[in-house]
Structure formats: C-alpha cells, structure tokens
C-alpha cells in the first residue's frame, strides 16, 4: 500500500521522508562541517511528543539505532548530556560516575528549551545553546549509523558515529541499561 500523507511517502506502514526536509540548526551545522548524514522525517501533530521507540517504528528502523538525547544536572549544577538507544534507560549512577559527579538527575522538562534551545521530543545533541559534556552509549561504537533528533519534532538525522564525533565532542560510555534500574 502506497500513500502520500503530509508530504511523506507511506509504504506498507513505513514512513519515508520526501526528498526535501526543512533544514534545522543541527543539519546546517553538519552541512557547514561538510559531514555526511541523511535527513529523515515522520508525521508529528503539533505538540505531540513521541517516544524514540514509536519514532523508530514510524521511520522503519530498529529502536536500537534510534537514540534519544537526555539532559541532566549534577549535584554541583553542572549539566551533562546523555545520548542512548531509545529502547533503553539512562543509568544515572553510571553517568554520574563516568562524568565525575556524586549524583546526577534529569533536568525538569520546563528547563529543556531555555537550556538547550530545543524542545522536549526534539532535542538534538548537535548545536545546543551551550556546549555541555556529552556521553553517548558505547552501544553506538560498532553501529554503521545512529539516528538522533534533528532539533525539532518530526525530524531525525541518520549519521555515522564517527561523523557525529566531528560535529560534537563526546565520549563513548556504558551509561544505559536494558531495564529501568533505581538510581
């Protein structure tokens, strides 16, 4: 079954981006650095926030390659960014240890936009308002590509980890768990 809805091609339930996706600041940053990536899009209504697993289904990818960007703060108010597979949970204990803090917790949702310049459900690790220490799940190391938010709901970036490394400074680390663990 082939259908075109909201300018997207739907083929047997898989959504494929049309040829032209509106550029985001994250995409422009990658273009400026001449880094290869693929822009993907999925249908998203207004303020609707979809989880990474749902997004993976909409773009026809495994949830293990669709990564979510999470922003945390430490006991001494340092901000730390974590990028993990959408089908996993952030281990606050592991992130605190690897980032050199005693304790880490998620920032309140209301602070995401003022801190990063991005909204919930559209937070990209690329081109945040400020540069924060960033840790990406070591599960990305051996993947040919990962998919991250492009900086707005409905837009994703498919990029090789080595190209992402050229765009932002990050460290691979064991920061996620398959099951939710109390921190």
Q: For the regions a protein language model found, what residue spans apply to each?
A:
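Extended, low-hydrophobicity, polar/charged segments
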Residues: 4-183
């Amino acid at each position: 079954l082939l259908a075109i809805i909201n300018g997207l091609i739907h083929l047997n339930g898989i959504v494929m981006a049309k040829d032209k996706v509106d550029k985001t600041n994250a995409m422009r940053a990658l273009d400026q650095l001449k880094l290869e990536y693929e822009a993907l899009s999925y249908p998203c209504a207004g303020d609707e926030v979809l989880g990474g697993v749902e997004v993976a289904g909409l773009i026809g990818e495994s949830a293990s390659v669709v990564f979510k960007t999470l922003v945390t703060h430490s006991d001494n108010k340092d901000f730390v960014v974590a990028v993990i597979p959408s089908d996993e949970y952030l281990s606050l204990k592991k992130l605190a240890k690897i980032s050199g803090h005693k304790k880490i917790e998620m920032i309140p949702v209301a602070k995401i936009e003022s801190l990063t310049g991005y909204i919930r459900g559209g937070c990209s690790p690329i081109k945040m308002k400020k540069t924060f220490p960033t840790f990406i799940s070591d599960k990305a190391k051996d993947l040919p590509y990962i998919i991250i938010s492009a900086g707005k709901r409905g837009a994703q970036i498919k990029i090789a980890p080595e190209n992402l490394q050229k765009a932002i400074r990050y460290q691979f680390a064991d920061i996620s768990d398959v099951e939710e663990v109390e921190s």
